[in-house]
């Protein structure tokens, strides 16, 4: 069932794993996860979050990786080949356009955010960030000026130029190499930030809060919904990015093992962010009362600028954020690049150029509405893509195909629990993510 045509690929197991970690580690880990941990009671939130990471890492991630690898295709080809087992290839391919377009739309919105990050990293580098001091009016005005329509054209174009330059070098030569550098550096620097912040007066209050468990709080259904949503969206199960990276993975490697590592390190990145941000806010005497861009570009800037060594802390922090954003953006755009290569038979550089023009033009135009743009894509299209991938793989392709795809390259067959848990529980979770997100205005 796999394509026999020449296809780019990851050159090593850890290159693949680090790229998948890079795709998963993004803004949700940095500006949403610490806020949710703070808002929902530290360990009271973490316990259900860990349970959902275990569930999704043991089902959805494995399934999407295996779907991509077994078909050697992105979503369009993968969905088509799965549906072809029931004589409905054209229907499957048509459905496959949904996660492809969703990934492109999310990438376009995310480009604006990565452009903000590039600008703030440059400000941290030249001292402009620290020069704002702790004057909240100045800090807020700076961010509002950046996030408005046409307010960040230069840095948005720079961010996309770096992104597409990486992609032009291919999967092994560009994406893998970039992630092999950026991901280890990100973890090392975040750990260093955590160690430094632990030495600051008042940071201990933040740590105590993180590890506080309120059993009564576990009875709140909304806690479980938001913990589930954070795990679901953080692990990048959307029927696109994980499928495409899986299609570049060697048949000789174990998908269950790779999936466990991706889930583990994505969770570790989120925990490191929480262990940096929550104690930092405590040390600065600030309340973590808001998540999203405001946390990162306003409140943390204020806190860092009041710390000893704040200029260096801000620089290191925004470098970490830049790496997290860039590696996620590469993955999001890769889905549509592969689709052009596959459907229009374009050379990689030509496909990258086409998507670069589209991505740059649209992202420049939507800067003023990027928040609403991202909400529509993340609330509706991403969970729909995950649900469609789950249905096509676990329901349409069937048990024999699924187990053969998952077990290929593994040292031992996956347990009997995997197929029913994935088919019934995981697919139900994907449907829940779609419904709950629509009803609550987003859960991840």
Predicted regions and their residues:
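Inter-helical loop and helix-membrane interface segments of multi-pass membrane transporters/permeases
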Residues: 4-8, 36-40, 70-98, 111-172, ...
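Transmembrane helix-boundary motif of multi-pass solute transporters/channels
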Residues: 12-52, 240-241, 246, 253-260, ...
């Amino acid at each position: 069932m796999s394509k026999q045509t020449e296809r780019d690929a990851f050159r090593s197991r850890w290159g693949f794993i680090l790229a998948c970690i890079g795709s998963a580690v993004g803004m949700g880990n940095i500006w949403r996860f610490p806020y949710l941990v703070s808002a929902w009671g530290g360990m009271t939130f973490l316990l259900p979050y860990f349970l959902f990471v275990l569930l999704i890492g043991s089902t959805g991630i494995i399934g999407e990786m295996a779907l991509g690898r077994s078909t050697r295709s992105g979503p369009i080809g993968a969905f088509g080949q799965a549906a072809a087992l029931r004589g409905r290839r054209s229907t499957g391919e048509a459905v496959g356009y949904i996660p492809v377009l969703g990934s492109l739309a999310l990438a376009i919105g995310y480009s604006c955010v990565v452009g903000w990050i590039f600008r703030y990293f440059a400000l941290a580098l030249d001292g402009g960030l620290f020069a704002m001091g702790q004057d909240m009016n100045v800090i807020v005005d700076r961010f509002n000026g950046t996030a408005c329509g046409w307010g960040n054209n230069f840095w948005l174009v720079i961010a996309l130029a770096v992104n597409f330059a990486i992609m032009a070098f291919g999967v092994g030569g560009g994406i893998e190499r970039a992630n092999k550098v950026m991901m280890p550096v990100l973890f090392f620097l975040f750990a260093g930030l955590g160690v430094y912040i632990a030495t600051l007066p008042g940071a201990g209050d933040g740590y105590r809060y993180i590890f506080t468990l309120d059993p009564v709080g576990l009875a709140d259904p909304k806690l479980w919904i938001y913990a589930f949503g954070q795990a679901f969206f953080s692990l990048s199960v959307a029927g696109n990015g994980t499928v495409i990276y899986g299609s570049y993975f060697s048949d000789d490697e174990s998908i269950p093992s790779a999936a466990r590592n991706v889930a583990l390190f994505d969770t570790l990145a989120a925990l490191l962010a929480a262990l940096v941000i929550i104690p930092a806010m405590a040390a600065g005497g600030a309340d973590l009362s808001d998540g999203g861009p405001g946390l990162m570009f306003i409140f943390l800037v204020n806190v860092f600028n009041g710390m000893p060594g704040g200029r260096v802390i801000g620089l290191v922090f925004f470098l970490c954020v830049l790496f997290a954003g860039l590696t996620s953006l590469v993955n999001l755009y890769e889905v549509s690049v592969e689709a052009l290569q596959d459907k229009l038979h374009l050379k990689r550089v030509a496909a990258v150029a086409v998507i670069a023009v589209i991505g740059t033009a649209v992202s420049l135009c939507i800067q003023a509405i990027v928040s609403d743009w991202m909400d529509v894509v993340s609330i509706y299209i991403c969970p729909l893509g995950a649900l469609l991938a789950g249905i096509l793989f676990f329901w349409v392709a069937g048990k024999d195909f699924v187990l053969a795809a998952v077990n290929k390259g593994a040292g031992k067959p996956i347990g009997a629990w995997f197929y029913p848990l994935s088919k019934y529980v995981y697919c139900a979770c994907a449907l829940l993510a779609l419904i709950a997100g629509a009803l609550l205005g987003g859960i991840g």
